[in-house]
């Protein structure tokens, strides 16, 4: 595997910076309901909740979609991957989360880089864009998953609430897990899709009717 260049690393840092306008800050992935329900009450339970999502839910599956989109040999294959990714959304809000972030990512990336990118949900858009721009697959998946994890930690910091130091400790602790999941999932294919983060999925469904909330999901 070729060593990533500084330009490639900095491009990924730009894509997954909070400054990149995909609106990730607006989504809690169901965490807001889990706090409301008393399932997440402190740093320990927040880290456990996020770990489950990474290992057994969207974290794992999104890396599969990134890898498959990166390797897609035709536009029809890419469309099929995108359809599968949308079908794996556990609730209407989860579908909205991946679709709207995907639309935003496609729009800004196609405007800044000369790539044909439109109509894709978030992980599929990332995989396709990484291929078109010539970015390394493994590093792209690691950056994506780390940004997803860090966004959930930021949400937990606001919702539980957690201290800034506790939040940064969780990010530090989960960074090796993000690397390990991405390394494994990006070498797999869509036959390895699975989802057993049931409490997180139920939380995403419950959030749709939550009375008072800060996040869109």
Swiss-Prot record:
GO terms for cellular component: cytoplasm. Its main location: cytoplasm. InterPro entries: UreF (IPR002639), UreF_sf (IPR038277). Keywords: Chaperone, Cytoplasm, Nickel insertion. It holds the Pfam family UreF. Signal peptide: none annotated. The keyword Metal-binding does not apply. It is found in: Cytoplasm. The keyword Hydrolase does not apply. It comes from the Bacteria. GO terms for molecular function: nickel cation binding. UreD, UreF and UreG form a complex that acts as a GTP-hydrolysis-dependent molecular chaperone, activating the urease apoprotein by helping to assemble the nickel containing metallocenter of UreC. The UreE protein probably delivers the nickel. HAMAP family: UreF (MF_01385). Required for maturation of urease via the functional incorporation of the urease nickel metallocenter. Belongs to the UreF family. This is Urease accessory protein UreF. It comes from Ruegeria pomeroyi (strain ATCC 700808 / DSM 15171 / DSS-3) (Silicibacter pomeroyi). The lineage of its organism: Bacteria, Pseudomonadati, Pseudomonadota, Alphaproteobacteria, Rhodobacterales.
């Amino acid at each position: 595997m070729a060593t990533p260049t500084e330009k490639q690393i900095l491009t990924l840092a730009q894509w997954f910076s909070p400054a990149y306008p995909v609106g990730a800050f607006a989504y809690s992935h169901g965490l807001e309901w889990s706090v409301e329900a008393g399932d997440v009450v402190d740093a320990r339970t927040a880290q456990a909740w996020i770990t489950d999502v990474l290992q057994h839910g969207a974290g794992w599956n999104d890396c599969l979609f990134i890898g498959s989109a990166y390797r897609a040999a035709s536009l029809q294959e890419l469309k099929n991957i995108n359809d599968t990714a949308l079908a794996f959304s556990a609730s209407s809000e989860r579908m909205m989360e991946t679709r709207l972030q995907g639309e935003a990512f496609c729009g800004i990336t196609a405007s800044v880089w000369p790539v044909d990118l439109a109509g894709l949900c978030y992980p599929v858009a990332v995989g396709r864009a990484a291929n078109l721009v010539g970015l390394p697959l493994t590093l792209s998946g690691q950056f994506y998953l780390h940004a997803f994890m860090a966004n959930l930690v930021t949400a937990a910091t606001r919702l539980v609430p957690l201290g800034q130091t506790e939040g940064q400790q969780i990010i530090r602790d989960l960074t090796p897990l993000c690397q390990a999941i991405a390394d494994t999932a990006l070498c797999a294919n869509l036959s390895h899709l699975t989802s057993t983060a049931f409490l997180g999925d139920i939380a995403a469904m419950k959030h749709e009717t939550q009375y008072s909330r800060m996040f869109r999901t």
